[in-house]
Amino acid sequence: MSFRNSSRMAMKALRTMGSRRLATRSMSVMARTIAAPSMRFAPRMTAPLMQTRGMRVMDFAGTKENVWERSDWPREKLVDYFKNDTLAIIGYGSQGHGQGLNARDQGLNVIVGVRKDGASWKQAIEDGWVPGKTLFPVEEAIKKGSIIMNLLSDAAQTETWPKIAPLITKGKTLYFSHGFSVIFKDQTKIHPPKDVDVILVAPKGSGRTVRTLFKEGRGINSSFAVYQDVTGKAQEKAIGLAVAVGSGFIYQTTFKKEVISDLVGERGCLMGGINGLFLAQYQVLRERGHSPAEAFNETVEEATQSLYPLIGKYGLDYMFAACSTTARRGAIDWTPRFLEANKKVLNELYDNVENGNEAKRSLEYNSAPNYRELYDKELEEIRNLEIWKAGEVVRSLRPEHNKH
């Protein structure tokens, strides 16, 4: 469809939605709010001023939930509460990088544990971590740490657990950012020690986004959970750490709910499902005689550049109100058909996540010695699909690339 956002229709949308306003910034400005930051940082930066208000009970469509905010944990409280702790970041991938730098910038005592002289070790040095002072091999970091933040990949956690487990001694805290290893313990063989707090903080975004939003003084939404509370302080510890690593708003969940919703989301609307829908529509348009440019524009470009940002900022109803009456009528009429078709697939997906089939598939694939080669091959196949080749050209024609 065409995105017919005339002045008349914009005013109608404004009347429909009350005081909310149409986004006026260019898409390039919107994109900058989620852009990946540079991987090089100064050794330390001053933590940005956070705009927060405290814990409150909020009504989510009739269900009341507690939501914690950063103001419960100002920087001074964080530093005092964790003054006797050493946060050991195990793994320096996406989450290790973002969470580690944020906690360090909050003034906490943070060290990093990775394989010596590997790519992550070298990246950590570039980011200001000092070998022998704040950067150590994994086992040494665990011995030195009091809060062990296991941010390795799921497959790597399974592989390294036999060596890590004996080092997580009484009095330490075991921290995860994903419930995978603990909930699917029959496959991962990860059984946390009985005499330590086991907690989870799961940022709702990549580690790069965690870092970017922190540097902008905002903060990412995160969930927290307690699997095992030995000290009686596991919950407050989890919330404090959530703030320390850059969270703005923090929601309570369980390890099981976190991992199931996460895996379903990634395979569904967030990545797999939307990719499948993009491909299906593009292929139908091409098979029916439309050009690659037209098919891509009506499938991906208009969605990501015009419509999805409005949904993210104001909601689906606002996006509908900003479009033509013809577009709205068709969207509303066809929604039940797509809902019916997709619920069947999503229920099948949920079952496969809940019964451990997806965990088994993930561990087997990502533990294979040649998994990187297989993964690169799959990405290359995606990259070479006509839809994304056409997309490269369409993106090059965006206004921000053609300033004269």
From Swiss-Prot:
PTM sites of type Phosphoserine: S261
Binding site for Mg(2+) 1: D262, E266
Name of the protein in its database record: Probable ketol-acid reductoisomerase, mitochondrial
Residue positions binding Mg(2+) 2: D262, E298, E302
Residues engaged in binding substrate: S324
Lineage top rank: taxon: Eukaryota
Residues covered by the KARI C-terminal knotted domain: 254-401
Residues given in the record as NADP(+) binding sites: 91-100, 115-120, 153-157
GO terms classed as biological process: isoleucine biosynthetic process; L-leucine metabolic process; L-valine biosynthetic process
Protein family: Belongs to the ketol-acid reductoisomerase family.
A molecular function (GO) term: ketol-acid reductoisomerase activity
PROSITE patterns, alphabetized: KARI_C (PS51851), KARI_N (PS51850)
Any Pfam family the entry gives: KARI_C
Organism name: Schizosaccharomyces pombe (strain 972 / ATCC 24843)
EC number, as in UniProt: 1.1.1.86
